[in-house]
């Protein structure tokens, strides 16, 4: 299963014979049954992709697990249902829609009102000058200059991470060597963390989509360099 999709309900079969019988049924559905129409999408999602985008979020309704992938001009998305081991697969209009599809599949509140802030316990403690106590105004170094940002005090309602990757997965889970996009939805609006995790800024659907597309664009550059 591609990260973050996973089995959550334990073993469905106690006897190996029952498992093998079910596996044969799935193969038949995949080859010439109701799954045949999505054979290409399933192959792309299971590893035969150029780029895949993985979204994991802890939401009030449960864990949100979404993965989108593209190959050549095709794009698809798989969304796992929170309370059971079933996945809905969507065929996207094109390979270039995986970023918008991930952003559109996530539900969160309106953008926060603070243009840029630090969030104790979420953003990284930053400088020796500020220490670890997070005063009301926090001064951090930004582009060789020191700037002061307000502290955001709010209740976190949900939080999520998104990664893009172009290389085959060696193991299940996030990739430590890849950039992680992180976001939070709070009682004072939705925020996205800066790439260095030092601050948060308001997050809209379009803003999230743009950040995802940025991750994808960097993978496209890596693919071209690898193939040249």
Describe each model-derived feature in a short phrase.
Residues 1-228:
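Short, surface-exposed polybasic-aromatic patches that bind anionic ligands, especially phosphate groups
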């Amino acid at each position: 299963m591609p990260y973050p999709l996973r089995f959550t309900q334990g073993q469905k079969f106690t006897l190996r014979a029952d498992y093998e019988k079910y596996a044969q049924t799935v193969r038949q559905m995949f080859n010439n049954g109701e799954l045949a129409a999505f054979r290409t999408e399933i192959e792309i999602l299971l590893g035969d992709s150029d780029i895949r985008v993985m979204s994991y979020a802890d939401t009030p309704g449960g864990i949100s697990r979404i993965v989108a992938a593209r190959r050549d001009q095709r794009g698809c998305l798989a969304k796992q249902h929170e309370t059971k081991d079933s996945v809905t697969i969507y065929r996207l209009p094109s390979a270039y829609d995986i970023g918008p599809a991930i952003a559109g599949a996530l539900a969160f509140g309106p953008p926060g009102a603070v243009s840029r802030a630090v969030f104790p316990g979420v953003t990284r403690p930053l400088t020796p000058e500020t220490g670890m106590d997070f005063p009301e105004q926090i001064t951090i170094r930004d582009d060789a200059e020191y700037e002061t940002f307000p502290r955001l005090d709010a209740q976190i309602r949900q939080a999520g991470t998104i990664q893009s990757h172009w290389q085959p997965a060696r193991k299940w889970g996030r990739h430590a060597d890849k950039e992680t996009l992180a976001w939070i939805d709070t009682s004072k609006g939705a925020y996205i963390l800066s790439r260095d995790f030092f601050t948060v800024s308001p997050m809209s659907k379009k803003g999230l989509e743009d950040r995802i597309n940025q991750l994808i664009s960097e993978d496209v550059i890596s693919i071209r360099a690898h193939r040249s």
